[in-house]
């Protein structure tokens, strides 16, 4: 107990210092990891509803946000790593912001978004009561190498889960995970028609994807509308308005509904759907920022499938478009995956920026997409973008570190939600 209190004091002191300096959200967590590897397990050990791990290639941050808001609608007090820092140091940093001076966490349940590889290490220390496994897709090539490696990480998360795993029945690699765990399994999914709007690395643009409808699912996404969605739950179709856009975000919503109904089975469906209708996009994941009366959508892209789905959902909109691609560690160094994305849906791109601006411009040229300005410096590029057709709505497709930089730059010009 004394060690836990001392670690908490040191961590909070580092966190306070970093906040005064205006950065380093995960650094306090890194310090705590170095001095006391048992801090996270101790802080999470007494939660009445236990720990939930959300993992997979795409959709972790958005899905976690939905899960948290739905659980809160049922009356539970939820701890989460809401900044999207999904390594264990991010969890530790988030804990430092929530525990009291003695290191006690006041919460009913913890819902944690975790990177697939780091989740494997995490579950060796903290066994989750529930896990939600979304999908397995090719991510940055220099991270995991093979798609089956990523699948093996999710298998280990499931094997460590003590009570219940919630799986995507329509992702073959995720569906097979039920064979690797002793925990009970629940499924979510979507219809074949909707699945074909989401080409995977296995069935890219072939149109031959078929939903695994022979497997009963707790929640099935059946219809996607401009500002609404329909879900099949307990044999009944339920329609709700939504603030989230895109088939993939609404599939994330189906996943979240399935998980929450597993954790709180007595929760009324209408309460969950009402809460879902109010969920706004997670930061940088379709988040809308207003500048001088004009909307700017930040659209995170980090792998072929994610970029393809973003373009399918948003590429045809009549908006000024910017693309910003970096190759820092958090983005992935190997950006050759950009050649696996079809950009022909874009008529033109006003500004291309980031460390890989010229690589991105070359890629666009092969799909005959006209480019206005190429400027590697993100600050200069953003200024150029904002004055170009200033009254027209805008969208920025951006890699992770480009997104966080652009978000910070925009916060210096207009109101941006503080997620620290």
Named regions from a protein language model:
Residues 64-69, 78, 257, 357, ...:
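A generic structural signal for short, well-ordered alpha-helical segments in conserved domains
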Residues 83-86, 135-139, 190-193, 326-328, ...:
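Short, acidic/turn-prone active-site loops that include or flank metal/cofactor-
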């Amino acid at each position: 107990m004394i060690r836990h209190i001392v670690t908490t004091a040191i961590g909070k002191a580092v966190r306070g210092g970093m906040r005064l300096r205006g950065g380093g959200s995960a650094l306090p967590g890194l310090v705590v990891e170095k001095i006391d590897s048992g801090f996270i397990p101790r802080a999470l050990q007494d939660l009445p509803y236990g720990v939930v791990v959300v993992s997979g290639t795409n959709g972790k941050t958005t899905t976690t946000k939905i899960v948290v808001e739905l659980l809160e609608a049922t009356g539970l007090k939820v701890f989460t790593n809401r900044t999207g820092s999904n390594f264990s140091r991010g969890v530790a940093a988030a804990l430092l912001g929530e525990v009291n001076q003695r290191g006690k966490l006041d919460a009913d349940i913890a819902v944690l978004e975790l990177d697939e590889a780091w989740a494997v290490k995490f579950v060796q220390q903290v066994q989750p009561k529930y896990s939600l496994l979304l999908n397995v897709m090719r991510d940055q090539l220099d991270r995991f190498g093979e798609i089956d490696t990523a699948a093996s990480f999710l298998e280990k998360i499931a094997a460590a889960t003590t009570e219940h795993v919630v799986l995507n029945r329509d992702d073959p690699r995720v569906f097979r995970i039920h064979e690797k765990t002793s925990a009970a399994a629940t499924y979510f999914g979507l219809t074949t028609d909707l699945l074909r709007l989401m080409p995977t690395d296995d069935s890219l643009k072939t149109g031959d994807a078929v939903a695994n409808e022979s497997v009963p699912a707790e929640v099935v996404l059946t219809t996607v509308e401009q500002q609404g969605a329909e879900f099949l739950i307990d044999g009944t179709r339920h329609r709700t308005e939504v603030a989230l856009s895109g088939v993939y975000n609404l599939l994330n919503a189906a996943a979240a509904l399935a998980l929450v109904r597993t954790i709180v089975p007595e929760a009324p469906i209408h309460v969950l759907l009402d809460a879902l209708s109010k969920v706004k996009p997670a930061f940088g994941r379709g988040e809308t920022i207003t500048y001088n009366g004009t909307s700017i959508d930040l659209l995170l892209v980090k792998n072929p499938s994610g970029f393809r789905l973003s373009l399918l959902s948003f590429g045809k909109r009549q908006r000024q478009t910017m693309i910003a691609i970096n190759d820092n560690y958090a983005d992935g160094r190997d950006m050759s995956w950009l050649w696996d994305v079809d950009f022909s849906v874009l008529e033109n791109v006003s500004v291309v920026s980031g460390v890989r601006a010229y690589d991105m411009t070359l890629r666009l040229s092969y799909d005959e997409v006209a480019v206005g300005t190429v400027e590697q410096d993100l600050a200069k590029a953003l200024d150029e973008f904002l004055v170009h057709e200033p009254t027209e709505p805008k969208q920025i497709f951006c890699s992770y570190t480009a997104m966080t930089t652009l978000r910070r730059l925009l916060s210096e010009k207009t109101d941006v939600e503080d997620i620290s």
